[in-house]
């Protein structure tokens, strides 16, 4: 898909905004906080990460690289690149016969920010942008954010605003999907099906209560309009196969909170988390989670977690054989129904300080992490496995 004039304008606006934050902010906000003014050197962090997801009909392998840099005068720049290799046999992904296919999604993002010293407070301003592309869609987004630190950073207030724009297409796989018409156009590529636009806003507050106790709370709002269905899904309506049809506007709200406590005698931390969600499609959800962190010596930390999720159904959801011609909206999306999920997992973090004095001493300030989660889904997606591993190296 070609990049629309609107998308080009959005990305240009992001570049201009980022340049303003990074280069001219000091003129009106005061002195920036520098990473290493004394030595005049840049500092940064490099992350190499592998992501894996598996369920009955879909497998995703996604290598990722992230780079963050901080200049001597306090400008922070980050970039992220991810490649998704998605193997699926799901009709919802465009399969029209019993085959598996693999397609690739490329995603890149950049962000820039700067923190300014306001005396007894610090203010960080930032901007970010993202572009994601695969054969049947192009997604772009941009955002701005601000973080205010008070009371010697024991109180942190954060706010963000973002814009998203997606061009949605359809590419069919299987049978004679590779056929072309007399003009040479691939018949499997149905072209642009629709577009989606949206804005999102979030605000959060984090407060240190005691040296070993802190709490946080957040509110998120997402407004989207446009094509909100899946171009590959169809519903049998009184014997007629009908394309999925969802409302064209959706407003989502989420409230979340976290309480964290560190037990110094046993080097153990407990995090209690809760998230509630509701939208104007009448879906409501609650999502409690508990995490336990345990230090195992000087170099190893183990995290275990359990997460519960349950939601109600949307106002237009029906069993697949219960839709009628009078229904304005029809869906085959399992996420529109009511269901319950359980997730159980662990994460292991190994600090690499033991590499000091060896040929790999350049890694001694970094760490390696490995995580594994098992998800029991109460809908037709069934059970799923999520795994990650990464190497994080500061420099």
Write out the residue ranges for each language-model feature.
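Residue-level signature of outer-membrane beta-barrel architecture
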Residues: 69-71, 114-116, 148-150, 207, ...
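Outer-membrane beta-barrel translocator/channel fold
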Residues: 58, 80-115, 154-214, 221, ...
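Outer-membrane beta-barrel translocator domains and adjoining extracellular loop/strand segments
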Residues: 58-63, 80, 90-96, 137-145, ...
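Short loop/turn motifs that connect adjacent beta-strands in outer-membrane beta-barrel proteins
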Residues: 25-43, 74, 117-123, 151-155, ...
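Transmembrane beta-barrel strands of outer-membrane/channel proteins
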Residues: 46-52, 79-83, 125-131, 142-144, ...
């Amino acid at each position: 898909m070609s990049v629309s004039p609107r998308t080009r304008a959005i990305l240009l606006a992001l570049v201009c905004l980022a340049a303003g934050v990074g280069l001219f902010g000091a003129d009106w906000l005061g002195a920036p906080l520098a990473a290493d003014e004394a030595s005049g050197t840049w500092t940064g962090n490099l992350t190499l990460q592998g992501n894996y997801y598996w369920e009955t009909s879909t497998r995703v392998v996604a290598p990722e690289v992230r780079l963050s840099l901080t200049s001597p005068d306090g400008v922070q720049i980050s970039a992220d690149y991810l490649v998704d290799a998605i193997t699926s046999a799901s009709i919802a992904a465009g399969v029209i016969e019993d085959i598996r296919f693999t397609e690739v999604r490329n995603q890149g993002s950049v962000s820039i920010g700067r923190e300014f010293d306001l005396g007894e407070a610090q203010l960080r301003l930032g901007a970010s942008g993202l572009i994601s592309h695969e054969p049947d869609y192009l997604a772009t987004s941009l955002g701005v954010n601000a973080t205010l630190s008070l009371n010697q950073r024991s109180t942190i207030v954060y706010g963000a605003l973002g814009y998203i724009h997606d061009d949605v297409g359809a590419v069919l796989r299987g049978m004679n999907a590779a056929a072309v018409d007399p003009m040479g156009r691939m018949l499997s590529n149905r072209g642009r099906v629709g577009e989606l636009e949206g804005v999102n806003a979030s605000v959060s507050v984090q407060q240190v209560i005691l040296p070993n106790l802190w709490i946080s709370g957040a509110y998120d709002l997402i407004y989207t309009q446009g094509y909100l269905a899946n171009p590959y899904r169809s519903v049998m309506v009184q014997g007629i196969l009908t394309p999925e049809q969802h409302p064209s506007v959706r407003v989502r709200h989420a409230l979340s909170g976290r309480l964290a406590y560190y037990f110094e005698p046993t080097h153990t931390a407990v995090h209690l988390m809760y998230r509630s969600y509701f939208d104007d499609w009448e879906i409501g959800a609650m999502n409690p989670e508990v995490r336990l962190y345990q230090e195992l010596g000087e170099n190893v930390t183990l995290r275990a977690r359990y997460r519960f999720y349950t939601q109600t159904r949307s106002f237009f959801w029906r069993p697949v054989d219960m839709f009628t011609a009078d229904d304005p909206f029809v869906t085959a999306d399992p996420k529109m129904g009511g269901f319950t999920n359980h997730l159980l997992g662990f994460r292991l973090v190994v600090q690499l300080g033991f590499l000091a004095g060896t040929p790999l001493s350049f890694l001694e300030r970094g760490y390696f992490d490995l995580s594994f989660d098992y998800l029991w889904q109460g809908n037709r997606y069934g059970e799923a496995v999520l795994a990650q591993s990464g190497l994080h190296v500061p420099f």
